[in-house]
Amino acid sequence: MMLADLRLYQLVSPSLPVGAFTYSQGLEWAIEKGWVCSAETLSDWLSAQMTGTLATLELPILRQLQTSLAKGDSDTVKYWCDFMVASRETKELRQEERQRGIAFARLLPQLGIELDDTLQQRVKQTQLMAFALAAVHWHIDSEKLCCAYVWGWLENTVMSGVKLVPLGQSAGQKMLFALAEQIPAIVELSAHWPQEDIGSFTPAQVIASSRHETQYTRLFRS
């Protein structure tokens, strides 16, 4: 069990070479336009994404993929991979999903997870497939996987905000400390989210992401 936990820490580490730190998911444009301009507004922005996207889209699909992979249900795996890509409302968000998936498809075999052609295709569709596949291979508990996934996203996004607003490193750590208190409730909500309601509910982020694609000066990829 301890080894599974250690594998999980590696999976969500900021040092993992999958490009998690290269995207702002619309945050850069939101800061440019003054929507996010302080620690308080950044915290509100991230909290809205946690409740309106992670809890209702990413974590429920991550759970579905992990369960379907464990059962060997390839049709359901394909359905949820397709669903995940279709749920990314902007070109920028779809590219991030695919490009991180491609990076995972290169990395996982180096970590002992062999991918046949079908699995490789699915991983290249969405990074969630990589997380689910690794969890099944390394016997990682679903609740721990979901908690770690949210933490990894939160850490990367807070650090992006620290650079862009800008905020001090201590302010970033204080924000992480506070927002982490929401993670158990987010994970719990995702466990009981109705399958027919799976989707994203963050229109401001979608607008920011679409506008970021043509933003004149960018630090983050589009």
Swiss-Prot record:
Keyword tags: Chaperone, Cytoplasm, Nickel insertion, Virulence
Top-rank taxon: Bacteria
UniProt source species: Proteus mirabilis (strain HI4320)
Compartments, record wording: Cytoplasm
Subunit relationships: UreD, UreF and UreG form a complex that acts as a GTP-hydrolysis-dependent molecular chaperone, activating the urease apoprotein by helping to assemble the nickel containing metallocenter of UreC. The UreE protein probably delivers the nickel.
GO cellular component, one term: cytoplasm
Xref: InterPro entries: UreF, UreF_sf
Functional description taken from the UniProt entry: Required for maturation of urease via the functional incorporation of the urease nickel metallocenter.
Family classification: Belongs to the UreF family.
Pfam family, one: UreF
Protein name, as recorded: Urease accessory protein UreF
Molecular function, one GO term: nickel cation binding
